[in-house]
């Protein structure tokens, strides 16, 4: 399944979750797009709820179904809770950590920064958004990319960096000190439903 590249706001409204991280998509119209307005939502079946939760998380991180399922299977081989491990692995993606550093206003913009070669890991350029960063590794912006407007604009509005990243705003550099804990990850996601979906 291909990665969704359509209007992010419309998708956010359909899933009932902010994919931009700003929440603006749901402020005026907190219901799915379509001609029937706020009265069109119907009660979902158990399968429908599981599918919706899976789609929420997949689109939140901007992944294809194949990438998403592969990461899910990898999480199942780790000790501990499958669902929590899955979310922890998703959070360690390079494009996500660039977003968490505040270098991009959305994960989609962060993915483009990585794709276009603006990001380095331990001093080496990495252009694979799905690259899994390991604790202790350092993420930075290439010297010639530090004045990009997209980065400057994001830095002006993003001022929260999670505790598992130590960020130097002057150097545009962060160290991934540890994996995230479940309490630091999106509370609006019920990962147990995703485990149930793939366990059918």
Curated annotation (Swiss-Prot):
Gene Ontology cellular-component terms listed: small ribosomal subunit
S4 RNA-binding domain residues: 92-152
GO biological process: ribosomal small subunit biogenesis; translation
Keywords attached to this entry: Ribonucleoprotein, Ribosomal protein, RNA-binding, rRNA-binding
Family of the protein in this entry: Belongs to the universal ribosomal protein uS4 family.
UniProt xrefs under NCBIfam families: PRK05327.1, rpsD_bact
PANTHER family (UniProt xref): 30S 40S RIBOSOMAL PROTEIN, SMALL RIBOSOMAL SUBUNIT PROTEIN US4M
Protein name: Small ribosomal subunit protein uS4
């Amino acid at each position: 399944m291909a990665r969704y590249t359509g209007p992010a706001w419309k998708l956010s409204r359909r899933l009932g979750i902010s994919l931009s991280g700003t929440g603006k998509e749901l402020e005026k119209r907190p219901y799915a797009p379509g001609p029937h307005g706020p009265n069109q939502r119907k009660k979902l079946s158990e399968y429908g709820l599981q599918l919706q939760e899976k789609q929420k998380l997949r689109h939140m991180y901007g992944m294809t179904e194949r990438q998403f399922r592969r990461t899910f299977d990898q999480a199942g081989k780790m000790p501990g809770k499958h669902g929590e491990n899955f979310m922890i692995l998703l959070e360690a993606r390079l494009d996500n950590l660039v977003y968490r550093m505040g270098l991009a206003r959305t994960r989609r913009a962060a993915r483009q920064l990585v794709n276009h070669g603006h990001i380095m890991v331990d001093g080496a350029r990495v252009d694979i958004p799905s690259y899994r960063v390991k604790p202790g590794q350092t993420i930075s912006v290439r010297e010639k990319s530090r004045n990009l407007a997209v980065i400057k604009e994001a830095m002006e509005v993003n001022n929260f960096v999670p505790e598992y990243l130590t960020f130097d705003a002057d150097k545009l550099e962060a160290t991934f000190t540890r994996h995230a804990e479940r309490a630091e990850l999106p509370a609006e996601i019920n990962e147990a439903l995703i485990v149930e979906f793939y366990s059918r």
